[in-house]
């Protein structure tokens, strides 16, 4: 019997867009169990609870979790940034994570911190040139 491959994606999903869906679809196709962690801060313009609901509806076969503690968002914000995020992820996902999927540079370091493989998904944005910031600035 083979061990199921656990995949992991995290993001703000503010709002979920085609790039996020590409990433999650890519990840879902390369693991047996996918966990999506929706991270939010109280001060953000779209409530985290709503984003969690959206991602849960989009990915009913994934385990979609929500984390809403105020923690550093960039390594420059805290010398303990990677320790904080490693423990945060382990607190919500105590099972081993085998693969971390991301389109951003942080994915490699996060995978290393978790003892997982890094699987980059379209890092050059060749498949989906989408920005959540641009969507929030001009939603229609």
Language model features with spans:
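Nucleotidyltransferase catalytic core that binds NTPs
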Residues: 1-140
């Amino acid at each position: 019997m083979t061990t199921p491959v656990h995949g992991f994606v995290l993001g703000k999903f503010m709002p979920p867009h085609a790039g996020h869906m590409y990433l999650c679809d890519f990840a879902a196709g390369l693991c047996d169990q996918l966990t999506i962690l929706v991270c939010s801060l109280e001060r953000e313009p779209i409530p985290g609870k709503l984003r969690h609901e959206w991602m849960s509806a989009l990915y009913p076969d994934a385990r979609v979790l929500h984390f809403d503690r105020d923690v550093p968002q960039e390594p420059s914000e805290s010398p303990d940034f990677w320790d904080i995020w490693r423990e945060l992820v382990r607190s919500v996902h105590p099972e081993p994570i085998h693969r971390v999927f991301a389109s951003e540079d942080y994915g490699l370091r996060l995978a290393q911190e978790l003892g997982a493989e890094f699987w980059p998904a379209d890092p050059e944005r060749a498949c989906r040139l989408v920005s959540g910031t641009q969507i929030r600035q001009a939603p229609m």
